[in-house]
Structure formats: structure tokens, C-alpha cells
Amino acid sequence: MSKPVLSTGLRWLWLVLVVIAIDFVSKQWIMNNLMLHESMPVMPFFNFFYAHNYGAAFSFLADKGGWQRWFFAGIAVAIVVVLLVMMYRSKASDRLNNIAYALIVGGALGNLFDRAYHGFVVDFIDFTIGDWHFATFNIADCGICIGAALIVLEGFINPTSKRSEHKG
């Protein structure tokens, strides 16, 4: 009993491709225009800074000898599969959740490509204010974080409708 793909959340797969494309093009531009660890000021508080991240967010487990590359790749594959199944099971009209899932899938695949091809993730978005410095990140990370925030927002907007759907 298959259903038409366009009636499911998979209708939002175009957004996955947009995130992957912007992430890929931006990382290619950074790798072609900056040397590793080179900084390019954009604004007083915002720089492009070319970095290799061998770990996860905030360089978690970056110095653990290489096994983390495949560990985080496996986590990314699992998350992508779960979210694609969730998108298939949801209605295309469930916009907020499907947009959130698509952003996360696009971000996960963008970073997965880096891990598989380079052995590290290319990070380059760098914010500093005075002595405060935020961890360097990339467009894929933005997709993941915005998607996660949208899932939380959906929980606040429709907390009871989701619970009743799962009960009945």
C-alpha cells in the first residue's frame, strides 16, 4: 500500500537538496580561497575562518585518533534514515515538521559527505565579540540547528494535537 510521494513529507526533499548545494558550494569556495586556519574578516564580529573539524559539534571527540569519523558518519546515516521514514509517514501539509526534518537531513548529508570524502568536516563561519568566541561552524550545521529549533517550536505550537495523533 504505497501512497503518492507528493502527498507525503517527502515532497519537501527539494529543501534537502538546497541545503546540500549551499553547504557544498560554500565549503568549496572556502577551500579554494583560504588557506587552512586563515581568517577573512567580513564584519568586526564575523569572519570566514577555514578549519578542519575531525569531531562533532564544538569539536567533540576531535582528538580521538580517527574512529570518530565513522562513528559520527554512522550516526548521521541513522538520523537520515529515521527522518526520511518520518517524512514518508507524515502528510505533505505538515509543513513545519517536514521543513525541520529536511533541514536536518540536508545538514547531516552535507557533513556526512565531508567526513566520507575528506575525513573531516569543513567549518568556516566564525563569530567573535570582544574576547568571546563561538565555535566555528558551517551551513550544514545551520540546517541541523534550525531544523532542531523548528521541532521544538512545533512542540510548543501544537503540543496536544501531536499527542492525540499518536494515541489514536
Swiss-Prot record:
Pathway named in the protein's UniProt entry: Protein modification; lipoprotein biosynthesis (signal peptide cleavage)
Highest rank taxon of the organism: Bacteria
Originating gene: lspA
Catalysis: reaction(s): Release of signal peptides from bacterial membrane prolipoproteins. Hydrolyzes -Xaa-Yaa-Zaa-|-(S,diacylglyceryl)Cys-, in which Xaa is hydrophobic (preferably Leu), and Yaa (Ala or Ser) and Zaa (Gly or Ala) have small, neutral side chains
Organism (species): Erwinia tasmaniensis (strain DSM 17950 / CFBP 7177 / CIP 109463 / NCPPB 4357 / Et1/99)
Membrane-protein topology: Multi-pass membrane protein
GO cellular component labels: plasma membrane
Protein name, as recorded: Lipoprotein signal peptidase
UniProt KW Aminoacyl-tRNA synthetase keyword: no
Record: active site: D123, D141
